[in-house]
């Protein structure tokens, strides 16, 4: 008898941690992840479709594509009821508040991963964003939505031409990065980054400290100070930062 091994359920990252992570910079985040041994957490080659950029963080809901096959991926698979060959609709209707849908399109931008109708449905269900390493369609509509939408391109070509939705909520690769269900997807104006779920709370703590420190360092650089001992900060500089915070963060003393 064959034993089918099951992964443990993903660690649940609370909305409180997500909201804190949404406020940290991608620079601090990737630096802190690098210190922990995660060398490349950034999804490369993607850009936001909508101009109303807002920082976000959410739990990954994953969708895995394989190449389409002519005898399966026909228009008839767009069924009016749940069906094994229409998993994309199933996934959209499973999305819960706080999730970011991440689509592994095998870096194939020849056909749209999805379009305005499905993305709108996910947004209404409480998703925090959607990401693909392929393309989306309906860019005119998507660009006006107050919702994070990242992709490698735009095309009107239907998904059925090139993509079959093979799995939901399994480990995937998107834009060269491994993503497990429940990992945190972080986005700002620069990047989409992945945070392993088990270190999300630690990253929130570390990045908040680093962002605060770097805001202080930036003021000193703007005031004309040289980088040596300032950036990266020496222990003396860190102590000066602590004293500055304790003193009420007096900006004028740094810029005079």
Question: What are these model-derived regions, one by one?
Answer:
Residues 33, 122, 183-185:
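Buried hydrophobic positions in well-ordered alpha/beta secondary-structure cores of metabolic enzymes
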Residues 237-256:
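Long, low-complexity intrinsically disordered regions
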Residues 132-133, 139-187:
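A contiguous pocket-lining binding segment that forms or flanks enzyme active sites
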Residues 1-93, 100, 215-236:
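Intrinsically disordered, low-complexity regions enriched in acidic/Ser/Thr/Pro/Gln residues
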Residues 186-226:
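A hydrophobic, small-residue-rich beta->alpha segment in the mid-to-C-terminal subdomain
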Residues 91-133:
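Extracellular/luminal Protease-associated
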Residues 40-41, 59-62, 99-102, 127-131, ...:
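Structural motif
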């Amino acid at each position: 008898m064959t034993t089918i091994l099951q992964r443990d359920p993903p660690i649940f990252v609370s909305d409180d941690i997500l909201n804190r992570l949404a406020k940290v910079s991608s620079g601090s985040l990737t630096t802190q992840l690098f210190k922990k041994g995660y060398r490349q957490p950034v999804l490369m080659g993607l850009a936001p479709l909508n101009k109303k950029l807002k920082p976000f963080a959410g739990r990954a809901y994953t969708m895995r594509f394989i190449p389409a096959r002519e005898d399966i991926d026909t228009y008839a698979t767009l069924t009016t009821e749940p069906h094994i060959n229409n998993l994309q609709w199933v996934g959209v209707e499973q999305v819960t508040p706080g999730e970011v849908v991440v689509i592994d399109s095998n870096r194939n931008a020849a056909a749209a991963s999805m379009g305005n109708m499905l993305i709108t449905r996910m947004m209404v269900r409480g998703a925090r964003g959607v990401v693909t390493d392929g393309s989306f369609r309906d860019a005119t509509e998507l660009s006006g939505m107050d919702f994070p939408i990242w992709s490698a391109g735009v095309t009107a070509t239907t998904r059925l031409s090139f993509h079959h939705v093979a799995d939901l909520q399994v480990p995937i690769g998107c834009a060269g990065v491994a993503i497990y269900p429940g990992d945190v997807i972080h986005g700002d104006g620069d990047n989409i980054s992945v945070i392993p779920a088990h270190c999300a709370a630690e990253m929130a703590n570390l990045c908040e400290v680093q962002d605060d420190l770097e805001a202080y360092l930036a003021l000193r650089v703007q005031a004309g100070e040289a980088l040596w001992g300032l950036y990266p900060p020496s222990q003396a500089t860190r102590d000066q930062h602590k004293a500055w915070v304790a003193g009420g963060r007096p900006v004028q003393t740094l810029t005079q």
